[in-house]
Amino acid sequence: LSLHDALPISFTGSADTAAKLRVNANIVRNSIPFNAEADSLNCAILADDVSPDDEEFDLFVKEVVREMTVKAGQKCTAIRRAIVPRKHLDAVAEKIKARLSKVVVGDPSVEGVKMGALASKSQQSDVAERVAMLRQSAELVCGGDAHFSLVGEGVAQGAFFQPTLLLCQQPMNTDSVHDIEAFGPVSTLMPYDNMEEAMALAKRGKGSLVGSLITKTPEVAAQVVPRLAANHGRLHILDRESAGESTGHGSPLPSLKHGGPGRA
């Protein structure tokens, strides 16, 4: 790491690596500007005004599954924490599980395949290790199998990882699910008992690139946005009326303070 006329250094990667770079002797000695985009435990909140019969319920499920599987979950904006009303926890879990069961994994050039491999075998090992860490405080809903069906020729040795959904029953009393990011097709369900608790859980991510709120009531959005805006690069509000034009939870928006081509 050289001075290079004190040009800023930007880093995108894990929080552990970012912490090491931040205290690099040359960076500190020469006061080189350093910016890191590290782990982001992004969340999506299903508001408690939404019931399983509402369109918004299906929109939430669709967003979570899409963010888990697009690019095999290797996105800094992917939904890592799915915050849902405890009264609808079972319904949410079953719907997400059903959708994930239809995701065909393998060679993306083969028709019908919906999800490909991770970037490398080392990344595969890292995701497996982090899922194991998460499972110390969360139970497995689906996935997590090292031996699962793949489609395509020559894929057996690929860095594939089965879409994995976890459930943390007591997220208010658990740190790991808010701190550990498995950078792959992995998300954790977190039940809440009221909207105050939902917002508190969202803030446990210690600042995220993006958060989503799925609600059918403008008043709920008006309550949540001022409370969470400072903790997120952007807030994505979704209901049945906006769904047709929505760019989705993980779509970069270059005109905002976060996101754009070449960025998250």
What are these regions (language model features)?
Residues L1, V104, E153-A264:
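Conserved C-terminal structural/oligomerization subdomain of aldehyde/semialdehyde dehydrogenase
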Residues D16-N173, E196, A200:
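ALDH superfamily catalytic-core signature
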